[in-house]
């Protein structure tokens, strides 16, 4: 019988976790239909069946870690259950038990659910939603069309969960608080704590960050940039740039990205990595831009930055950031980069020592722009908008001289942005 196996995900991803089965044993499956949602350390992916038939066996449970190439389900011939009806029938007794011990109060709620079930299913079919969201909505008896009107996008499982939480908060607040207090009291009467499992993504991130710290000779060097000229140039070019590039705004990230490319060309060791006893120097410039999301920090890559102009870089950064926050990043967006830029300044960070990303040799940290007095010469002090920048690097590949030179190049280019803009 045909087996459903974990597909090749990406070069750096060898395993994942079963987040949710979208189909159950006995359900009919179409060719190309998603049957399971798999969580990796990068993104969540839906695994599809290569054959049409009936899901006959699940070879892994939700929460299990599975490897690339591992069989996780068996699909056989025949026609299976109508999955749009099965979950509703299975959920009914569970809802009765959880919502109330009073049979009289439970009956009206059950009747209401039955009356609206057909209408909700019809509405749900017209909504643009992921398979996991449809399944979850069916189980909870939620109309996806109401959620779609609020989300203005593809409805995902978290949207359904948020909707359910909002409608039931008042009813559940008091019992939930009592239950939480009970758990905390049992653990330690005088010192309350909350214990929860880390997501796979957080566990993987923690593991990789520790590996980087343990397996590299990481060092950080600093410099500062007078942002006066680049801020003035951006202000002068802002409106014209928007007109010339169909509404694209000129931000600071494109300046730093282009400056990083120029510095990487001048100091190729910063664009390298160690592979065993070899050093691999990359001849491409795929720059990662760190994006903060609800799931933590994600680093999608802007490809071929040396071949893109300012507007193209700004567009791609904006698109990748939106995809990251909407949980729509693909694996191709997240792997095989050459260098990373992170901007702690958006959170108010004045200075930091960023940790190198994966197999890369260095990471550039941007920070807050702070106006402070600067000595222009021996007799002149002026208030200038200043930014500290940091380069964390692997000292096994990059010497201190190259690291300092790299940051100095960034500084010179940002402080003389006209040249950078003209070169682009």
From Swiss-Prot:
What is catalysed by this protein? N(6)-[(R)-dihydrolipoyl]-L-lysyl-[protein] + succinyl-CoA = N(6)-[(R)-S(8)-succinyldihydrolipoyl]-L-lysyl-[protein] + CoA
Which top EC class applies here? transferase
* Cofactor binding, per record: Binds 1 lipoyl cofactor covalently.
- Compositional bias of kind Polar residues: 122-131
Biased region (Low complexity) positions are 162-176
Please describe what this protein does: E2 component of the 2-oxoglutarate dehydrogenase (OGDH) complex which catalyzes the second step in the conversion of 2-oxoglutarate to succinyl-CoA and CO(2).
In its UniProt entry, what is this protein called? Dihydrolipoyllysine-residue succinyltransferase component of 2-oxoglutarate dehydrogenase complex
Encoding gene, per UniProt annotation: odhB
């Amino acid at each position: 019988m045909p087996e459903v196996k974990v597909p090749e995900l990406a070069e750096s991803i060898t395993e994942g976790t079963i987040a949710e089965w979208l189909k159950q044993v006995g359900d009919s499956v179409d060719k190309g239909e998603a049957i399971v949602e798999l969580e990796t350390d990068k993104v969540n992916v839906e695994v599809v069946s290569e054959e049409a038939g009936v899901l006959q066996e699940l070879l892994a449970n939700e929460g299990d870690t599975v490897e690339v190439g591992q069989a996780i389900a068996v699909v056989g011939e025949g026609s299976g259950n109508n999955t749009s009806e099965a979950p509703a029938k299975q959920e009914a007794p569970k809802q009765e038990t959880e919502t109330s011990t009073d049979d009289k109060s439970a009956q009206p709620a059950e009747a209401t659910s039955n009356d609206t079930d057909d209408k909700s299913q019809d509405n749900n079919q017209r909504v643009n939603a992921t398979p996991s969201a449809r399944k979850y909505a069916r189980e909870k008896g939620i109309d996806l069309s109401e959620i779609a009107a609020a989300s203005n996008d593809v409805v995902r499982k978290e949207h359904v969960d948020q909707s359910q939480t909002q409608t039931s908060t008042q009813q559940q607040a008091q019992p939930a608080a009592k239950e939480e207090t009970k758990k905390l009291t049992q653990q330690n009467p005088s010192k309350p704590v909350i214990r929860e499992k880390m997501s796979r993504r957080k566990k993987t991130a923690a593991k990789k960050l520790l590996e980087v710290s343990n397996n590299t000779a990481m060092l950080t060097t600093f410099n500062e940039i007078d942002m006066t000229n680049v801020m003035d140039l951006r202000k002068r070019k802002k409106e014209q740039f928007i007109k010339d590039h169909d509404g694209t705004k000129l931000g600071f990230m494109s300046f730093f990205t282009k400056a990083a490319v120029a510095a990487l060309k001048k100091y190729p060791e910063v664009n390298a990595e160690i592979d065993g006893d070899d050093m691999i120097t990359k001849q491409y410039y795929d720059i990662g831009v760190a994006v903060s999301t609800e799931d933590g920090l994600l680093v999608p890559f802007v490809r071929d930055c040396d071949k893109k102009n300012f507007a193209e870089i700004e567009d791609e950064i904006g698109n990748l950031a939106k995809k990251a926050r909407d949980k729509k990043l693909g694996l191709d967006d997240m792997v095989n980069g050459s260098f990373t830029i992170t901007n702690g300044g958006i959170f108010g960070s004045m200075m930091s020592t960023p940790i190198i990303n994966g197999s890369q040799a260095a990471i550039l940290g941007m920070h807050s722009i702070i106006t402070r007095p600067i000595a222009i010469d021996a007799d002149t002090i002026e208030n200038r908008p200043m930014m500290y920048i940091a380069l964390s690097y692997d000292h096994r590949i990059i010497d201190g001289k190259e690291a300092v030179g790299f940051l100095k190049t960034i500084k010179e280019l940002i402080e003389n942005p006209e040249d950078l803009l003209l070169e682009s």
